[in-house]
Amino acid sequence: MDDIYLSDVRMKTLKPVSNKPSGVNGCCYKYKNGVIKLFNYNLTNYDKENILSHLNKESKIILWPESLVFKKGFFKDKLKGYYMPMAKGDNLIALRNKILTGKKDVSFDEILSIYYDKFLPELKKEEVLLGDVKMAHVFLSDNLSLTDTDAFDIRDDYCEKIYKCNLSQVNYSIKMLFDYIISSELRFNTSKSVLSKETFLDDMIKDISKVTDSSVNSLLTLNNYKRSIKWD
């Protein structure tokens, strides 16, 4: 897809994608069939270049940017952000709310299946380290999609470099997913679950340690968090 050039007037007409479209790096707006993320004004050109430098991988579950977005200028066009596909399905917040109100029937087994059969294998294959993963960034439809892709670590074998996350650490990211599973457990049909919650948590920690080369401190934080959870 070609780069996108918008006038100042056109940029002011863009509609936010949600009630809370802003993050550390920018704000997301609807544009045609996708989303434009416009950088915050306080970001320097170096910050923008650093963010964009690793947005060059393709994955079936990660919504990578497809085009750069420029604001038209009289003398020079200015880089303002990037364009990416729109995530399909419900994010985990919307899914949880539908479960709580009885509008959707999702079992704990289905969540486990999505995690084990689709989520982890694809991340391992692409060698992606999660960055700012939380309920608002994980979408479920027929597939699982991840947004906020400027917050990942990507191993690039071609140049033997790991591009670092701009946000967050592993333990923060995984904790958000734990919180979702735990807070919603009473609404899931757990009678047919093959794995207990304790086993699920242990396996997640073990799998994350395989996917990432994270430090001992990060894994210790995960284990300390596990011990602090009350399962009853």
Locate the predicted segments by residue.
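Conserved hydrophobic "DFG−1" position in protein kinase catalytic cores
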Residues: K30, M86, F139-S141
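Conserved structural core of kinase catalytic domains
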Residues: I62-L112
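Conserved alphaE helix
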Residues: S107-K124
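Catalytic-loop of the protein kinase fold
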Residues: L120-S141
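C-lobe/activation-segment region of protein kinase-like
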Residues: S141-D232
